[in-house]
């Protein structure tokens, strides 16, 4: 007996990240190889032609799991009964644009989308915000959807997590899949703090294996934090395929579980680790039965506290910068 189709809404559907994302969702990479999906694609009126072109390509792949596609410029149509919502579209920073202008331009988008999710999405909708500034955009959407559980709203730190894994594997000579218990704390921005104090590879402590504080401080942390900028510098375009891959990883693990492995998600704070409630902050979690659970009680040393507070300060500044645009 085939499972009933799940509805997956994707915003910014004509964009580069979506182009790397949609075919993988239709192939079963997001929700499992036995789970049919209906894609509900949202983009601006002027992008509808481009979205139709992408849908022609989706049709031409003849994916067995793709049960249907909706194309729209109306968030209430895109989010109708959505089980998963990937909020990829956001206002990019244009030349000469101040950060506060970027925040308010995105606040406009994410208040509307949060309100639409509140009105029409499944009450169990799993929301992942990919569009930057992702943590604050997720916060805005969450605050604009008072009837949905706060825990439904998450921001993507998985790209930073995967970038950190890759750097640690290269430095230690261990296979990337063998590395466990990595954490990335804070904002999806260069202030984030990738933390491998607890990490192991094949049962060995990575901290002992690498044993290089200078590398950690002067190479590892900045490399992970500035990787996006390095890719733009090298490629002339921002990272799209790796971002799409991280979005798939994030939602797949949230839905299907991590088998006890730590992953990083930006989630609403419950006040632990000195992070004020409701701030969407990257923390290590494990997922099972469709729920994430933060790893609790980790020791925070002085260096980590300083790094965690630094990225928190940026998030608080962003939150305060959009406070006047939010109703609650």
UniProtKB/Swiss-Prot annotation:
<dbReference type="GO" id="GO:0006108">
    <property type="term" value="P:malate metabolic process"/>
</dbReference>
<feature type="binding site">
    <location>
        <position position="113"/>
    </location>
    <ligand>
        <name>NAD(+)</name>
    </ligand>
</feature>
<dbReference type="GO" id="GO:0006099">
    <property type="term" value="P:tricarboxylic acid cycle"/>
</dbReference>
<feature type="binding site">
    <location>
        <position position="163"/>
    </location>
    <ligand>
        <name>substrate</name>
    </ligand>
</feature>
<dbReference type="InterPro" id="IPR022383">
    <property type="entry name" value="Lactate/malate_DH_C"/>
</dbReference>
<keyword id="KW-0816">Tricarboxylic acid cycle</keyword>
<dbReference type="Pfam" id="PF02866">
    <property type="entry name" value="Ldh_1_C"/>
</dbReference>
<feature type="binding site">
    <location>
        <position position="99"/>
    </location>
    <ligand>
        <name>substrate</name>
    </ligand>
</feature>
<comment type="function">
    <text>Catalyzes the reversible oxidation of malate to oxaloacetate.</text>
</comment>
<keyword id="KW-0520">NAD</keyword>
<dbReference type="InterPro" id="IPR010945">
    <property type="entry name" value="Malate_DH_type2"/>
</dbReference>
<feature type="binding site">
    <location>
        <position position="132"/>
    </location>
    <ligand>
        <name>substrate</name>
    </ligand>
</feature>
<dbReference type="InterPro" id="IPR001236">
    <property type="entry name" value="Lactate/malate_DH_N"/>
</dbReference>
<protein>
    <recommendedName>
        <fullName>Malate dehydrogenase</fullName>
        <ecNumber>1.1.1.37</ecNumber>
    </recommendedName>
</protein>
<feature type="binding site">
    <location>
        <begin position="130"/>
        <end position="132"/>
    </location>
    <ligand>
        <name>NAD(+)</name>
    </ligand>
</feature>
<dbReference type="InterPro" id="IPR015955">
    <property type="entry name" value="Lactate_DH/Glyco_Ohase_4_C"/>
</dbReference>
<dbReference type="GO" id="GO:0030060">
    <property type="term" value="F:L-malate dehydrogenase (NAD+) activity"/>
</dbReference>
<feature type="binding site">
    <location>
        <position position="106"/>
    </location>
    <ligand>
        <name>NAD(+)</name>
    </ligand>
</feature>
<feature type="binding site">
    <location>
        <position position="93"/>
    </location>
    <ligand>
        <name>substrate</name>
    </ligand>
</feature>
<dbReference type="InterPro" id="IPR036291">
    <property type="entry name" value="NAD(P)-bd_dom_sf"/>
</dbReference>
<comment type="similarity">
    <text>Belongs to the LDH/MDH superfamily. MDH type 2 family.</text>
</comment>
<keyword id="KW-0560">Oxidoreductase</keyword>
<feature type="active site" description="Proton acceptor">
    <location>
        <position position="188"/>
    </location>
</feature>
<dbReference type="InterPro" id="IPR001557">
    <property type="entry name" value="L-lactate/malate_DH"/>
</dbReference>
<dbReference type="Pfam" id="PF00056">
    <property type="entry name" value="Ldh_1_N"/>
</dbReference>
<feature type="binding site">
    <location>
        <begin position="12"/>
        <end position="18"/>
    </location>
    <ligand>
        <name>NAD(+)</name>
    </ligand>
</feature>
């Amino acid at each position: 007996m085939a499972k009933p189709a799940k509805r997956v809404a994707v915003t910014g559907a004509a964009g580069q990240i979506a182009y790397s994302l949609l075919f993988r969702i239709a192939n079963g990479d997001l929700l499992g190889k036995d789970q049919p999906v209906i894609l509900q694609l949202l983009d601006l009126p002027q992008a509808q032609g481009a979205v139709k072109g992408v849908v022609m390509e989706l049709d031409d792949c003849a994916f067995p799991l793709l049960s249907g596609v909706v194309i729209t410029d109306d968030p209430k149509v895109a989010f109708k009964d959505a089980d998963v919502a990937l909020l990829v579209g956001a206002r990019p920073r244009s030349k000469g644009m101040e950060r506060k202008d970027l925040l308010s331009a995105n606040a406009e988008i994410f208040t509307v989308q949060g309100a639409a999710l509140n009105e029409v999405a499944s009450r169990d909708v799993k929301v992942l915000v990919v569009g930057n500034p992702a943590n604050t955009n997720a916060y805005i959407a969450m605050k604009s959807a008072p009837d949905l559980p706060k825990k439904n709203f998450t921001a993507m730190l998985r790209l930073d997590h995967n970038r950190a894994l890759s750097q640690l594997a290269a430095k230690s000579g261990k296979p990337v899949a063998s590395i466990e218990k990595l954490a990335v704390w804070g904002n999806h921005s260069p202030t984030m703090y990738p933390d491998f104090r607890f990490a192991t590879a094949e049962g060995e402590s990575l901290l002992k294996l690498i044993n290089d504080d200078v590398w950690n401080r002067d190479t590892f942390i900045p490399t992970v934090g500035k990787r996006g900028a390095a890719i733009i510098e090298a490629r002339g375009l921002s990272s799209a395929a790796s971002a799409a891959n991280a979005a798939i990883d994030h939602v797949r693990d949230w839905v299907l579980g991590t088998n006890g492995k730590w992953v990083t998600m930006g989630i609403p704070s419950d006040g632990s680790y000195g992070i004020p409630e409701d701030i969407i902050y990257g923390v290590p979690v494990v997922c099972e039965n469709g729920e994430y659970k933060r790893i609790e009680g980790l020791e925070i040393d002085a260096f980590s506290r300083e790094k965690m507070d630094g990225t928190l300060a940026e998030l608080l500044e962003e939150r305060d910068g959009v406070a006047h645009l939010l109703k609650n």
